Structure formats: C-alpha cells, structure tokens
C-alpha cells in the first residue's frame, strides 16, 4: 500500500475507511518517531533561556559525584566542595571579627548586620512580590500572544478549508466529466486491444 497513489478530493470524493486508518496509523508512527526535546522556535523566542548562576557548580557536581555511592560519593562531594570554595571563596569573615575592640570595626560589623536585616526583613519581601507580579504579567502576556497566534492560524486553516471546499464543489462537475471521458477512452482502448487479438 506504500506505493499506492491516492488522488482524493475530500469534499467531492468518498474514501474507503481502510485508507484513512492507514494514514492515521502512519501519522501516529511518524509523530512518535519525532524527538521533541525543545519547544517550537517561536515559543522559545518568547521565553529566552535563563542561565542559573549555579549551572557551572552543578555541572562540576554532576561530572564528579553522580553515580557514586557510599564513601566514594562522600569523598567526591568533599573534593567538589573544596574545588568550589577554591574558585569562589566568598566573604572573608575574619574582617568581621566580633572579638575586636576597635570601634570602627565594630561599627562596620553593626552596619553590615543592620543592612542584612533590612534586606531580609523589608526589601526582600517587597522585591519578591514585585518580581512575582512582573513574572506573572510577562507570562500572561506571552500566553496571550501564543493564544492569539494559535487562533489566527486556526482561522487561516478554517478559511483555507472553506476555500478548498468551495473550489472542489464548484469543479465537481468538471471532475466527473473528465473521469467519465477517461473511462470511455479506457473502455475504447480495451475494446480495440481485445479486437486486435
């Protein structure tokens, strides 16, 4: 059946159900064979990839630790942690020594801690709420854009189907005439061929 040529006009012709079943089966098999690891490129444009600042560290962890068990895993984790601390030493805590008697250093420590307290108790909740609202608004806008595009495409498909239907119905008489003419010539050729035998 793979070599059969099917010439079919859906709004004029009738088609045997077995052909439709075969087409559905083939389409299902082809769709199952397609790997869809990514979103459609137009969707990916709306949602650009965000690189997390821990991606590199996680890659190091994944390369060295994942798959290990027991003491081997613990030793590998310690090695990864040492490497990360070497690469990214963080804040030097020795600068903020509470045991110091130096009033300037103690004032610096107090200011730093007060700043941390303000950030955690007042600024962070406001910022998170604003970030949440901004992200929600962005996602709603992106979703609306995708829905609009989908609706436009569905309308275009429906319009194209209506055009095809009108065209096929308008030309149905010509198709029947051409088919009848083809059959008559075929019969005539067969009769002539049979008469020559």
Swiss-Prot record:
Transmembrane segments: none annotated. One of its GO terms (biological process) is mRNA processing. It is found in: Nucleus. InterPro entries: SPF27 (IPR008409). GO terms for cellular component: spliceosomal complex. Keywords: mRNA processing, mRNA splicing, Nucleus, Spliceosome. Involved in pre-mRNA splicing. Associated with the spliceosome. This is Pre-mRNA-splicing factor SNT309. It comes from Eremothecium gossypii (strain ATCC 10895 / CBS 109.51 / FGSC 9923 / NRRL Y-1056) (Yeast). The gene is SNT309.
